[in-house]
Structure formats: C-alpha cells, structure tokens
Amino acid sequence: RDYYASRGLGDVYKRQVPTLTIAGSDSSGGAGVQADLKTFSAIGTYGMSVITAVTAQNTEGVFAVEELSGEIIKSQIKAVFDDIEPAAVKIGMVSSPEIIVDIVNTIKKYNPSFLVVDPVMISKSGYSLLKPEAKENLIKYLIPMAYLVTPNVPEAEEITGIKINSVTDMKLAGEKILELGPKFVLMKGGHLDGDAVDVLIGENIFHVFKSKRLNRKNTHGTGCTISSAITAHLALGYDIKESVALSKKYITEAIEHSFDMGHGVGPVHHFYKFEESKIK
C-alpha cells in the first residue's frame, strides 16, 4: 500500500483495490475474463484484465479458439503492473506451453503477493482449452509459483494421475499438487456425487467446505467465478480460509439466482445482490 501512498493514490486504493485476471475471453460473457471482471466488481474490487486468447463460444459450446501472441500478453501484463499494481492476480486459461513460459517469466519480475491459478483444461461443453504439450509447463512452471491452485476433479486427476472418487482421494491428490510448490490447494469436488464438497489443503491446514448441491442447469463459468471471487477476497485482506468460505457462499447464491440466457447452459447471476436490493 506504500506504493499507492507514494503516488498520492492512497484514498483511491482504499476505495477500490485493484485485482487482475489473466485469462481467455468468452464471447457469451458467462466465463473467462468476462466472468472474472463481473465477480471482481460484485465483490467490490477494481478489475483489470490481460487477454490470453479469444474464444468463440456461447451457452451451447466452444466453437473456436485463437491465442494471442506472447508479445502482446507480456505487454499487457507490463502495462498493468507498471501503472496500477494489483493486490492479487488470478490466472485462468493459458493454452500453450509458450504462453505459460511468457506469463511466468513476466509475472516473476513483479512477484505479486497473491497469485491464484485456476488450471483450466476443458470447457464445460468438453472443448479442450489446454494443449496436451502445455500440461508439462503448467505443472513445472506455473503451479509452483501459485499462492493458491483451484483444480476441479478432472483437472486434479490430469495433474496428479490419481483417480478421485471421495474426499480421501481429494486429499491425496491435493497433497500431491501441494508438493509441486504452491502454498495452498483448493480441491473442488463439484464433479462428485452428493453435497458440493471442496477441500482446502496447505501447511497446517486441512479444511472441508460443504454446501448443498443445487439443482440448477445454469452453471456456465462457475470455476472461473469462484477462483476470481477468492482472488478478490484475498485482495481485500481476508485470509485464505475466510476467502474460500466467502467465495463458496457467493458462488452458491449466484447459482441459486442463475437465469436462462441462450439455449444451453446459462450463466450464474454475478450481481444477484444488486438485483435483490433493486426489487426491494
């Protein structure tokens, strides 16, 4: 915060804490950078973005992906950090090995306090968003520098090679990911049967978060949303356990208030709180 005070921006910082997402664009607005920015705003931080790829997608699927060049990605990161240093950073879709290396090398120069890595691999509709040859760089370079990694069950299975069918399996896989170097791992159990169970694992911490499973079809962008919600709460000064708990509550209510948009799997309602106040 001294950085802001030295530039005469102390009061601005208190009003709007800057947060950054580095991820792909979703043309339908439900996931990716669009979901991240909506989440940052809903929670009360100032959202900034670095686009890594442009996707042509809607509620029915992903139809095309075009990566941006490493040079423009690096330039975006530099432009943000050199002017508005983010209090926390979330990294989502990074599809190629070259892009991962470019991002890692650039981010290292700035060493953000909180780096949340959401290891996006496959879209909800089944479209592969991470090239097979990029997985090695994700594991070798990006995950080790993270403050928190937020894999779902299929992603954790891909990273660890462990088949996950229970909370015990989630713990084993999470501990294996923790060995790669991040400070914390949040294993998201939404793909398992029963209640929605997430497991937070770190040094001297093992906490199981349980919430009711909602019978809603509109869940497009839930993974992006919870990881960016955690990023925003960390930026606001909450500790890791509080950040996860508050973000679980936020995503649960956003799903509860989700609405039909398009012909497929619709988005969650990022601004449900404002809708409720408007109705009142």
Stretches with model-predicted labels:
Residues K14-T21, S41-K124:
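Conserved N-terminal subdomain of the carbohydrate kinase-like
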